[in-house]
Amino acid sequence: MPMQITAMDKSSYKDAAAIMAQCLSHPWSEKVLFQELSNPNAHSYVAFENGEAAGFLSVWEVCGEVSINNIAVVEKFRRRGIAKALMEHMFTELCDAVSANLEVRRSNDAAAALYRSLGFKRVGERKDFYSRPTEDAILMTKYLNGEK
């Protein structure tokens, strides 16, 4: 069965929590993810590969601006285009948005390369933004309906 991307719902928020727990140094709890289901500004997606939860993307959209909160792909599913597919799915779903913003660890070259390939541009940085370990964040933005 090919990759399937679905909106996170009551049947998949625990899958999203498991992905985050495996991949992120500060994962959201199941409770927080469940609360996201009732947030009208929250849009979360889960990617399944052969029926197995493989990736997760969480964004908030407010006044046409998308803030990418978390993206994670389980290690055994990495380098298969899942993160890119999640991002492209989100762009399609939120087609009326004007821009998308994210932070990426300075050392995360693979993620930064993915974001650049999707049209994100570096717009700044935040000193010591991340902990475990302490690291700067690179700020990136993509204008969704034409370059500004």
Give, region by region, the residue ranges found by the protein language model.
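A generic structural signal for short beta-strands and their flanking turns/coil linkers
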Residues: 64, 69, 98-100, 136
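Conserved glycine-rich acetyl-CoA-binding loop
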Residues: 70, 74-88, 105-113, 117-118
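Conserved GNAT acetyl-CoA-binding A-motif
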Residues: 93-104
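Conserved beta-strand edge residues that scaffold enzyme active sites
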Residues: 34, 108, 129-130
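Extreme N-terminal starter segment of soluble prokaryotic enzymes
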Residues: 2-5
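Acetyl-CoA-dependent GNAT
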Residues: 7-76, 87-89, 93, 143-147
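Conserved catalytic-core motifs of GNAT/GCN5-like acyltransferases
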Residues: 101-103, 116, 121-138
